[in-house]
Amino acid sequence: MSQALTLARPYARAAFAIACEKGKCMQWSQALTFSAQVANNPIAAALLCHPQIDHEQAAALLSPEGADPAYVRFLEVIAEAHRLDVLLQVAGLYEKLRAEAEHVIKAKITSAIELAPNELNNIVTALKKRFDCEIEVTTGVDHSLIGGAVIDTGNVVIDGSIKSKLTRLQASLTH
């Protein structure tokens, strides 16, 4: 996985630089998401690896309808370098670069029960204050947490679950 990220990083940076230069960051984001999904389809992946498919045809197959010509050329470069297998990682890294540039942090909030809208708003407000940027939230429910919540922003994990508190208490009692 880390090798795929290492290979994908320069492509993601190049895509982000080109998209920003053209003022089309969101369009490229959507196009990369589409292309990564197509490339990850086993049938499409087999077709893309076929020796009779050249890099221009591969780029055409992966491009969404009406894609920016520079985006299509970007896909041609990746196909020519035989790196279509890291397109999913390119898309993920591109999204991170876009979020950083837009001062947005993506947070995953997992709680023992579904959070009420006002509870979720309170958490988002606290996260905005702590990180001084906008927060995009996805939520999930994990009953094994017993109570509380776990907030994962990618770089920071805030674990306020009862499960982790009980685990820490157990560890302190056994040592």
Swiss-Prot record:
Keyword annotations of the record: ATP synthesis, Cell inner membrane, Cell membrane, CF(1), Hydrogen ion transport, Ion transport, Membrane, Transport
Cellular component GO terms held in the UniProt record: plasma membrane; proton-transporting ATP synthase complex
SUPFAM superfamilies according to UniProt: N-terminal domain of the delta subunit of the F1F0-ATP synthase
Membrane topology qualifier: Peripheral membrane protein
First-listed, main subcellular location of the protein, grouped into a coarse class: membrane
Signal peptide: none
Cystines in this chain: none
One Pfam family linked to the record: OSCP
InterPro entries documented for this protein: ATP_synth_OSCP/delta_N_sf, ATPase_OSCP/dsu
Subcellular location(s) per record: Cell inner membrane
Molecular function terms, GO-annotated: proton-transporting ATP synthase activity, rotational mechanism
Its job: F(1)F(0) ATP synthase produces ATP from ADP in the presence of a proton or sodium gradient. F-type ATPases consist of two structural domains, F(1) containing the extramembraneous catalytic core and F(0) containing the membrane proton channel, linked together by a central stalk and a peripheral stalk. During catalysis, ATP synthesis in the catalytic domain of F(1) is coupled via a rotary mechanism of the central stalk subunits to proton translocation.
Subunit note: F-type ATPases have 2 components, F(1) - the catalytic core - and F(0) - the membrane proton channel. F(1) has five subunits: alpha(3), beta(3), gamma(1), delta(1), epsilon(1). F(0) has three main subunits: a(1), b(2) and c(10-14). The alpha and beta chains form an alternating ring which encloses part of the gamma chain. F(1) is attached to F(0) by a central stalk formed by the gamma and epsilon chains, while a peripheral stalk is formed by the delta and b chains.
Family the UniProt entry places it in: Belongs to the ATPase delta chain family.
PANTHER family (alphabetical): ATP SYNTHASE DELTA CHAIN
Name of the protein described by the UniProt record: ATP synthase subunit delta
Originating species: Xylella fastidiosa (strain 9a5c)
